[in-house]
């Protein structure tokens, strides 16, 4: 279990989308280990290649997503999860980051889903790649929402704004976790 900082930033009520940087295959397990209630996770469709894997990952709340093209079925499932009051974990970089510093390009799905479901986004940051029996840290950043944008029609310009807010807030949370800046 990692050392968790910023627990006070977790919303006490309601559901939300968690966005987190992504270093390794164990990242979802690390985050799942700290949760008491059901947490759904977007996971690459390749994890669902056999009936056994599909059953296993589905039991843990994984929702398969095709990272190569828009996957409307996955988005619909995620929106249903949010509408039903559960939380959703998304790794918006779309793949593992092998560099351990700045974020890779952020994909647009997490912002769009939070905006559509009208739920806040909570940025999580792993300080570095998780290693068993080592000092591992997870920092929970301040939640943000898109309430100032509600009522706007979906457009590519709006999607860019949603994605940029994810990138800015997640990068700030990563920088705090890695000691580059101080938490406010």
Each language-model region and where it sits:
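A generic structural signal for alpha->beta connector loops
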Residues: 1, 36-38, 59, 85, ...
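N-terminal signal-anchor transmembrane helix
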Residues: 1-13
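Residue-level marker of motif borders
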Residues: 1-3, 22, 88
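Short, flexible active-site-adjacent loop segments at beta-strand->alpha-helix junctions, enriched
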Residues: 8, 22-23, 35, 45, ...
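Catalytic core of membrane glycerolipid acyltransferases/transacylases, capturing the structured
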Residues: 10-69, 77
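Alpha-helix initiation/capping motif
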Residues: 46, 64-71, 103, 155, ...
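Non-catalytic C-terminal accessory region of glycerolipid acyltransferases
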Residues: 75-184
